[in-house]
Swiss-Prot record:
Segments for region (Sufficient for interaction with PIC8): 1-219
Family the entry assigns: Belongs to the eIF-3 subunit B family.
CDD domains: RRM_eIF3B
Domain RRM: 37-120
Protein name per its UniProtKB record: Eukaryotic translation initiation factor 3 subunit B
Cellular localization per UniProt: Cytoplasm
GO biological process, one term: formation of cytoplasmic translation initiation complex
Encoding gene per record: PRT1
Cross-referenced SMART domains: RRM (SM00360)
Task of the protein: RNA-binding component of the eukaryotic translation initiation factor 3 (eIF-3) complex, which is involved in protein synthesis of a specialized repertoire of mRNAs and, together with other initiation factors, stimulates binding of mRNA and methionyl-tRNAi to the 40S ribosome. The eIF-3 complex specifically targets and initiates translation of a subset of mRNAs involved in cell proliferation.
Record InterPro entries: EIF3B (IPR011400), eIF3B_RRM (IPR034363), Nucleotide-bd_a/b_plait_sf (IPR012677), RBD_domain_sf (IPR035979), RRM_dom (IPR000504), TIF_beta_prop-like (IPR013979), WD40/YVTN_repeat-like_dom_sf (IPR015943)
Cited Pfam families: eIF2A, RRM_1
Length: 732
């Protein structure tokens, strides 16, 4: 046997080795011509010979985007072009760039260019080339764990994510106790903060090459979405689609999911469950970017994006084609928004399916006033138009249940030195969609509707156009509620005709810059969060809209609200805050990426009491895991509310056990003793019945004798509670 050390080069049989493939790859062309510089283009228009110069000029201009065009030959036969041509580029790199840019490009509605290198012709024509297509190899289906397993937690606990430095971990909430970790902490799990999908099914992380989805009990990796340098993401309402955005344009390649039609685009829409690329979009030049760039209807049947003087609405079920095959032309359109729920319009209530509603607005021009519109889909019918004058901006605020939409109209005086706000509230469930107008003397900065209710809160300030002192608290917090009718006190979710909103209370001299409602309604947190500029310290105020005590903050009484401040927290450094899905707990935290002092988080209950506080070095982010909507019917919810006292005993016991370990051990011990006694009693009963035919624990019937045989005796006992002596003037 020949060893490797004794092997010599002259002993290798070189003549038996086939070098034909290497010779073809590295052969030197006669005359120094490199055929990789030449392109063969198919799919060009067949034009008369007289129009060849025009066609050559158009194609030269197109291919010059990839590099300098040295020569272009367009064959002509019988007075017409043959539909293909040959192009010589200045370099191999320019030719490859042209293939990437224009292979598959639509020249017009009838012509799509197919671009190949001239050397490809030899490869495709060789005997070794496989000309017959084969079915692609479909990878085996990889089953995943139950993606909503966290909802099966016996104690109904919620999960949250903590990010510290480059470490990320998921935890179970245990109120005041140390939270339980889900798996191990992961290093560099995401380049940025992680995000949950709207219903909590997926956890999404950022990476250099795109986005990754995670799920299941142990947060296993599910899918990867290739989009280099991705900076933003969004998920559609039903979690069907993932939207990713990168500032760098897409460059198609063999190892990417992008085709030639995606060249230069920056927005991708993916199927979140399968990981397939559904659609890519470009961004119009000089466009004002308003995130999210792609917005979806509540049921993911339609999506839309803003363009210059047009609104593009896509029919998702029709492979993301434009609705009606064309853009919705709107001169000067500034913004749009889909209703978060389906709307039962009065003229359409006989139909079972609710209506998809969309709102948008256009600014003032020389010929027409500013207008806000409500449009139904898919018929694009305008069901309401609100005319506005002297407008500087309009913001759209949808009610969570889509019972109302508020157009926040920021107006100005004719001199444009003073700004103020009008609120135009459209009542979508009433006949002809009436509009309630609330005129305010100050400018609204923030507005938030109560979830599952009809009340709202605003933060505003006087804006006279002058210089402001950032050290002086100048903001107003205003609380609004619908007026209360004396004849019928209907459910708060439905407003009778002509019902109006009234100002319940104004709190002045505030730095407040954020409003956060509990998802369950009733409680609202008005906050001053650190923004790194003017605000250096944070504060937090909790308000109860249904306070049951005697004294309230109400300035008017004929409203469906009993407002009271229940807690005030100040001298903090919060930069962010978020409620959990139940609406029981609010987390406020200080992020190291925004502020360097006292980084960490605090969990408050809805009454403003601190449940857990933890200072964490280099703390970055806190995220509650959302929950899907309840599957209970209205009747089942009503039954649960009716038996709430019965259930609350069990919940209070669980909370007590969580808060006091000694009490928990005592309760568990008593439960075990009671269970043992019940078991012993049943065993004794069965033994006596089987051995002695003796039944224990007999139930004796009550005495049915005539009640007249009994005499009822009443005993009255008097007790002196207080004795006083008082001198009385005599009339004698």
């Amino acid at each position: 046997m020949t060893t490797l050390e004794s092997l010599k080069i002259e002993d290798i049989p070189v003549d038996d080795i086939d070098f034909s493939d290497l010779e073809r790859e590295f052969q030197i062309q006669d005359g120094g011509v490199n055929f990789d510089n030449f392109l063969v283009v198919d799919g060009a228009p067949v034009a008369p010979e007289a129009k060849v110069p025009v066609l050559e000029k158009v194609l030269t201009k197109l291919f010059s985007q990839a590099g300098k065009v040295l020569d272009m030959q367009i064959p002509v036969e019988d007075g017409k072009t043959k539909g293909h041509l040959f192009i010589e580029m200045e370099s191999v790199s320019a030719a490859k760039e042209a293939i990437q840019l224009f292979n598959g490009k639509k020249l017009d509605a009838k012509h799509r260019l197919l671009v190949n290198s001239l050397n490809d012709m030899e490869k495709y024509g060789s005997d070794d080339f496989e000309s017959q297509s084969h079915e692609p190899v479909v990878p085996d289906f990889a089953p995943t764990d139950f993606l909503r397993s966290w909802l099966q937690n016996q104690d109904g606990r919620d999960q949250f994510v903590l990010q510290k430095g480059d470490m990320t971990r998921v935890f179970w909430n245990r109120l005041a106790h140390q939270p339980d970790g889900v798996g191990e902490a992961r290093k560099n799990w995401s380049n940025d903060v992680v995000k949950f999908s709207p219903k909590g099914t997926y956890l999404l992380s950022f990476h250099d090459q795109g986005v990754t989805s995670w799920g299941g009990p142990n947060f296993d990796r599910l899918k990867r979405f290739f989009h280099p340098d991705v900076s933003r993401l969004d998920v559609s309402p039903t979690e069907k689609f993932l939207i990713t955005f990168s500032m760098n344009p897409i460059k198609p390649g063999e190892d990417t999911p992008f085709g030639p039609e995606s060249e230069g685009h920056q927005i991708c829409v993916w199927d979140l469950a399968t990981g397939f690329l559904m659609k890519t979009f470009g961004i119009p030049p000089n466009a004002k970017l308003q995130w999210p760039l792609i917005r979806f209807s509540y049921d993911d049947k339609y999506c839309g994006r803003l363009g210059p003087n047009a609104l593009a609405i896509y029919d998702i079920e029709n492979n993301f084609q434009l609705l009606d095959g064309k853009l919705h032309k709107v001169e000067g359109i500034q913004d749009f928004s889909f209703a978060p729920k389906g709307v039962q319009l009065t003229y359409n209530r006989r139909k079972s399916d609710p209506t998809t509603l969309l709102a948008y607005w256009t600014p003032e021009t020389n010929n027409q006033s500013c207008k806000a519109f409500l449009m139904t889909l898919p018929n694009k019918r305008i069901v309401k138009t609100v005319n506005l004058v002297q407008v500087s901006n309009v913001s759209i605020h949808w009610h969570e249940q889509a019972d109302f939409v508020c157009f926040q109209v920021d107006r100005h005086t004719k001199s444009k030195k003073t700004f103020f706000t009008n609120l135009e509230i459209c009542k979508l469930n009433e006949s002809e969609i009436p509009v309630e107008k609330i005129e305010m003397k100050d400018r609204v900065l923030e507005l938030a509707w109560e979830p599952k209710g009809t009340r709202f809160v605003t933060i505003s300030k006087m804006d006279n156009g002058g210089e402001e002192n950032p050290m002086y608290p100048k903001n107003f917090v205003k609380f609004f509620a619908p007026e209360k009718k004396d004849n019928k006190d209907k459910d708060l979710a439905v407003l009778p005709d002509q019902l109006k909103w009234k100002l319940v209370k104004t709190v002045d001299q505030q730095f407040a810059n954020c409003i956060s409602w509990s998802p369950a309604g009733r409680f609202v947190a008005v906050c001053t969060i650190v923004n790194g500029k003017e605000i250096k310290k944070a504060s937090l105020d909790f308000y109860d809209f249904d306070f049951t005590g005697e004294k309230t903050l109400n300035e008017v009484q004929d409203v469906k609200a009993s407002l009271q401040a229940v807690a005030h927290i100040d001298n903090q450094f919060f930069t962010d805050l978020e409620w959990d899905s139940s609406g029981r707990f609010l987390t406020a935290w200080s992020s190291y990426s925004k502020h360097k002092l006292e980084n960490g988080y605090t969990i408050y209950n809805c009454c403003g009491e601190a449940v857990r506080k933890e200072i964490v070095d280099q703390f970055r982010n806190f995220v509650w895991r959302p929950r899907p909507e309840s599957l209970l019917s209205n009747a089942e919810k009503k039954k649960a509310r009716k038996n709430l006292k019965q259930w609350s005993v069990k919940f209070e016991e669980q909370d007590a056990m969580e808060s006091d370990s000694a009490l928990r051990d005592l309760i568990l011990k008593r439960r075990a003793e009671l269970s043992a006694w019940v078991s012993y009693r049943e065993q004794s009963k069965e033994r006596l019945e089987s051995e002695d035919s003796y039944t224990i624990f007999d139930n004796f019937e009550s005495d049915k004798a005539d009640e007249t045989q009994y005499v009822t005796v009443e005993e009255v006992k008097e007790e002196i509670l207080e004795e006083t002596q008082e001198e009385v003037e005599s009339f004698e």
